[in-house]
Amino acid sequence: MDLIKKLTGKNPDEYEAVAKSLVDNSDVNLFAKLVKQDDFLFDFVKNNVANRIKKVINKDNYLNLLNFLDNYSASYDSVIAEGLYNFGGVEILPALKEIFVNGNVEKKAYALKYFSLIPREYIEELLPLIRQTALSEFEPLSINSIEVLSKMDDEIFKSEALQRLNSEDEFEQYNGVKYLVAFKAVDALPQILKVMKKSSFSENIASEIPYLIPVEDLIKTEDGILVLCNIVSAIPEIIPPSAVIDYNLFSVFEDLYLNNLSSASAVLLRLAQEKFAE
């Protein structure tokens, strides 16, 4: 049977043996095949695989994980970073710094996931470079960079992202929004909403906001209702239909109808009715 099927399957004897062999033998080819399946596996399956890999990592084989870094996957970056940190601590920090400085974008993204687990003082000198990689067009590298900067409370990056909101270039404004959302800058919401109301990218901006503020909180204000109106309007042309599930929209609509009906929410509900009746 195909090893990927065994690793993702339900037979403990099979998936435990494959996971152990994967790490013990540093099977780069098998890991590369696993990463290529990312778009075809359900999230719960990938979570199962990550947990299976996690259970077989130990003090004797954790360094083998370094051989997997050319094949990036957001599904497995945490388990790899945690394995390296849990068994290598800061002793392997020099190796990860070298990978971050000189590696390809995939390796840099993994290194940053590791950096997100260690105290600021150990990577202080790398912060200027991390601010640069936060602007990378390789999204995992950007996201993982901003995660580190957020955990380090890096006010320089946050300030630069806020400045982008004042740009006359709407692409720059939108990038600023994405950076602030990834940074978890909740206090920037008023500025983000102000940009959204004026921007021709209002629907794109709206789609980012639920990753900063829960939809259940957004419905408590008229500005939040406007965010949801923009999101509904953008489905499916700009925002994929899966957003209905991601944002738990039907439950939100039901709550509005039963408990929080207002003139603003009535507009949203009417818009949703017309959109999803199509």
What do these predicted ranges mean?
Residues 9, 26-28, 40:
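N-terminal "mature head" segments of proteins
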Residues 13-25, 36, 43-58, 67, ...:
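Structural detector for internal amphipathic alpha-helices that build alpha-solenoid repeat scaffolds
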Residues 28-31, 62, 92-93, 123-127, ...:
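Core helices of alpha-solenoid repeat scaffolds
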Residues 75, 126-127, 171, 198:
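HEAT/HEAT-like alpha-solenoid repeats
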Residues 1, 24-27:
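Short alpha-helical hairpin
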Residues 1-2, 61-65, 157:
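Repeat-mediated protein-protein interaction surfaces in helical alpha-solenoids
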Residues 1-19:
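N-terminal "cap/leader" segments of large eukaryotic alpha-helical scaffolds
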